[in-house]
Amino acid sequence: MKKIKAFLLTKSVGLYINFLSYVLPRKAFQLAYVFFSNPRSGKLQLESLPEILHTSNQEQLNLDGHTIQTYHWSGNETVILLMHGWESNSSRWEKLLTELLNTGSTIVALDAPAHGLSDGKEFNVPLYASFTELVIQKYQPKYIIGHSMGGITAIYHQYHYGNSELKKMVLLGAPSDFSIILHNYLKLLSLNNKIKKAFYHYTRERFQIDIDDFSGQKFLKSSPTQGMIIHDTDDTVVLFEEAKKLAATWKSATLMSTNGLGHSLHDEEVNQKIVAFLLEA
């Protein structure tokens, strides 16, 4: 019954936006963009912070009026940065964190825009990448692990900002093409072509990039960074085809497929292989 109600609500919202696109097109796109970019979960409250995050040194960084929440576990000179995905936060790394901390490494995690304890209502990849750049400047990690939208943000960051010190990058359930993400959203709400065109125009105007060019395949084409792509064949959030696209163009990366883990990829064996890949000579 809940699924039916959610389906009807979603389609009703899409129907309203489509109607609005003919009478108030600007308002229609604004509404569509809010639903697309404003996460509905993933926030944290300081008074009820998950225990794993309590064990860290917490610091808030500031960037152009934004507050960026970071978590820092001190260790040796090996610094690893963790980047979570959509409607999530840094606590999602709890099981992997245990494995990483056992190596004595220094671990840094950040909450994405509008997630965790970071402020704001809007999430977008360029903004997340700017958060990441500030954290990288401060902590200078040599290794990055990104899940889902954290993965594509790590790719975009490396392409846009460039970090010559980055040695290895691990992508977990990461999408390649932003056009696929948008297509799935438009399909979910059954939004019309007017809204699609508005998204393309807005992205070009605001971020100076065409949606069809916002592609991990293109960003990684000449990347010398060693990589590990981990993706589950049963992932229904980001299809396995996205991992195959990344692996086809990222020549210095290996693709590891799993079965039955879904999008989250929470698994002890996966975590052990990540640690082995990062710390092998």
Where are these regions (language model features)?
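An N-terminal hydrophobic leader/cap segment in hydrolases
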Residues: 3-60
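Conserved alpha/beta-hydrolase
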Residues: 90, 97-119
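Alpha/beta-hydrolase active-site loop
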Residues: 122-142
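Gly/Ala-rich beta-loop-alpha elbow adjacent to hydrolase catalytic centers
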Residues: 146-154
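Hydrolase active-site cap/lid region
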Residues: 163-209
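Short beta-strand/loop motif that positions the catalytic acidic residue
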Residues: 222-224, 229-231, 235
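Conserved alpha/beta-hydrolase "acid-adjacent" motif
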Residues: 236-242
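Catalytic histidine-centered segment of alpha/beta-hydrolase-like enzymes
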Residues: 261-271
